[in-house]
């Protein structure tokens, strides 16, 4: 079945390409999704009229993706996880976890757009690549940390010390009175 692509389709072609696909794929997916139309003479003429509008829409989407890329470059995503002995994670950090953390920060990123070769299984900082558009990729900084973060004991001791001296001073004042 010959079709004219009305949008960029991964592993198939880009806007305006005439491609040959299996009939079921064309009839059941590409045409109903509005990604393609049959390659007939009438459709070719109609497509030439629509092509400018579709190209403007594609350019608009690319511009939005570039803006999102710039915003994501400034963001640091922190995911806190439980760890065992030797700072070994219970489980792993996956694209779903990263997408959820981004959603909490008001970034609507599909988990399938987050490019992880393997799940993250150790603490640290990572640069995660995100496919925002077929032509635009962005990066976000991910920090995987322990639940509760690092605990600093020195400030806690300083806070307790004045309280003990105040109690001692109150006790001295009570005995003098």
Curated annotation (Swiss-Prot):
The keyword Ribosomal protein applies. Signal peptide: none annotated. Gene3D superfamilies: Ribosomal protein L9, C-terminal domain (3.10.430.100), Ribosomal protein L9, N-terminal domain (3.40.5.10). It holds the Pfam family Ribosomal_L9_N. Keywords: Ribonucleoprotein, Ribosomal protein, RNA-binding, rRNA-binding. Residues 151-177 are annotated as: Disordered. GO terms for cellular component: ribonucleoprotein complex; ribosome. GO terms for biological process: translation. It comes from the Bacteria. GO terms for molecular function: rRNA binding; structural constituent of ribosome. SUPFAM superfamilies: L9 N-domain-like, Ribosomal protein L9 C-domain. HAMAP family: Ribosomal_bL9. Belongs to the bacterial ribosomal protein bL9 family. Binds to the 23S rRNA. This is Large ribosomal subunit protein bL9. It comes from Maridesulfovibrio salexigens (strain ATCC 14822 / DSM 2638 / NCIMB 8403 / VKM B-1763) (Desulfovibrio salexigens).
């Amino acid at each position: 079945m010959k079709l004219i692509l009305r949008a960029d389709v991964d592993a198939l072609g880009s806007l305006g390409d005439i491609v040959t696909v299996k009939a079921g794929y064309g009839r059941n997916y590409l045409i109903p999704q509005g990604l393609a139309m049959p390659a007939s003479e009438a459709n070719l003429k109609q497509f030439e009229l629509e092509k400018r509008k579709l190209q403007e829409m594609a350019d608009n989407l690319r511009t939005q993706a570039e803006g999102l890329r710039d915003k994501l470059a400034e963001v640091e995503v922190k995911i806190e996880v439980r760890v065992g002995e030797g700072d070994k994670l219970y489980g792993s950090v996956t694209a779903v976890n990263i997408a959820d953390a981004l959603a909490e920060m008001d970034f609507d990123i599909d988990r399938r757009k987050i490019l992880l070769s393997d799940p993250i299984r150790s603490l640290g900082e990572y640069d995660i690549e995100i496919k925002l558009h077929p032509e635009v990729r962005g990066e976000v900084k991910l920090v995987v940390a322990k639940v509760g973060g690092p605990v600093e004991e020195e400030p806690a001791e300083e806070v307790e010390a004045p309280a003990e001296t105040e109690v001692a001073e109150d006790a001295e004042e009570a005995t003098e009175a």
